[in-house]
A protein has these predicted regions:
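Active-site-proximal beta-strand elements of phosphoester/diester hydrolases
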Residues: 4-12, 32, 119, 151-161
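Active-site beta-strand/loop signature of hydrolases that rely on acidic residues for catalysis
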Residues: 5-10, 40-43, 47, 54-77, ...
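Extracytoplasmic/secreted cell-surface and envelope-processing proteins
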Residues: 75-78, 102-103, 163-166, 205-210, ...
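Metal-dependent phosphoester-hydrolase catalytic domains
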Residues: 186-196, 203-321
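Active-site His/acidic residue clusters
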Residues: 21-24, 28, 148-172
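N-terminal, active-site-proximal structural segment of metallo-dependent hydrolase catalytic domains
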Residues: 1-86, 94-100, 104-106, 283-291, ...
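Structured beta-strand-rich core segments of catalytic domains in phosphoester-bond hydrolases
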Residues: 65, 71-151, 159
Length: 321
């Protein structure tokens, strides 16, 4: 039995309604991106077709769990799972609003026939600037559930950006890593051998301190209790990427696995099988400034009929029936 667990930054999945409490004016008909209802319908249809095919070379059903970032609200999630391309997955939604000043959240979609949520919560990442003013960013979404009679914990992230410079902003992402470790510590008190997956757009690469030190990312042969294996590090070292930022390619989108998902002594439970970046030709820009990079949704002040400025990533785990 093989299950696919994915993560996708869907690049500003906003509806076209101007909400008073969020900075969403750019994503309206009269806003900077001249974003219409037809644009929204096209974007959400395209995203649904992409999601349905993630990991499909190995399984016929599409992904079983899908973490998302840059979604505006619950309504866009309902619209997304209601698309014909996702009908067969019968996806449930886990989402809570974050205090992010842009109005974007993280969420988890799950196949209701496969995954049963037990509990979930948002955990704040509290940040302040040099003047002591609060910086509002995305919460970490923690989900605890059962898949094929086995407990899993999923942490969905979208860490603070590199705005202001990578080094200057690195402490913010390290704080987000610390929040993850705090959640993991709490889980481990009652479940020392918990199977945990940390996923997200980390705005850092697999070799950066927030991942290597903050999340205790190690290679397979060096894992101690509390450490995590990051299959995306090898991909990064091979030159693979999921997005471009300021003319530099990066692999910000990652999924890490706790040590119990790497053990080979117990054949009865889920084990890591493989990881990948889903980037078929349809998701790659064929011309223009971003040729060879993800076919983004918005360019030059308009919807450009693309999908996202990130590629989705996934891991596959397997177990004996």
């Amino acid at each position: 039995m093989v299950r696919t667990i994915a993560f996708y930054n869907v690049e500003n999945l906003f509806d076209t309604i101007d909400q008073e409490d969020t900075l969403d004016e750019d994503y309206t008909k009269d806003g900077r991106n001249h974003y219409t209802s037809n644009d929204y319908k096209m974007k959400i249809s395209g995203l649904s077709e992409v999601i349905a095919k993630i990991g499909s070379k190995r399984t016929a059903n599409g992904p079983d769990l899908i973490g998302l970032s840059e979604i505006e609200n619950a309504q866009v999630l309902f619209d997304l799972v209601d698309q014909p391309a996702l009908d067969s997955l019968s996806l449930g939604i886990i989402h809570k609003n974050s205090p992010d000043r842009r109005g974007i959240d993280v969420a988890l979609l799950y196949r209701q026939a496969v995954f049963f949520p037990l509990e979930y919560d948002n955990v704040e990442v509290q940040l302040w600037d040099k003047k002591g003013n609060r910086i509002y960013t995305r919460d970490v979404l923690w989900v605890h559930g059962i898949m094929d009679a086995e407990e899993l914990h999923i942490l969905v992230n979208h860490w603070p950006s590199r705005r202001g410079g990578s080094s200057e902003s690195s402490h913010r992402r390290m704080k987000a890593a610390w929040v993850n470790k705090k959640i993991i510590s709490r889980i481990s008190q009652s479940q020392p051998e918990a199977k945990i997956l940390i996923m997200g757009d980390f705005n850092d690469d697999p070799v950066d301190d927030s991942i290597k030190v903050g999340l205790s990312s190690k290679s397979k042969g060096q894992l101690n209790p509390g450490d995590f294996f990051n299959p995306m590090e090898k991909m990064y070292n091979m030159g693979w990427n999921t997005m471009v930022y300021r003319d530099q390619v990066h692999l910000f989108d990652q999924i890490l696995l706790s040590r119990p998902l790497l053990k080979t002594t117990d054949n009865s439970g889920f084990k890591f099988m493989k990881a990948g970046i889903y980037n078929p030709e349809i998701l790659i820009a064929q011309e223009g400034k971003y040729k060879g990079y993800p076919l983004r949704s918005f360019q030059n002040g308009k919807y450009s009929k693309g999908y996202s400025d990130h590629y989705p990533v996934y891991v596959q785990i397997s177990k004996s029936r």
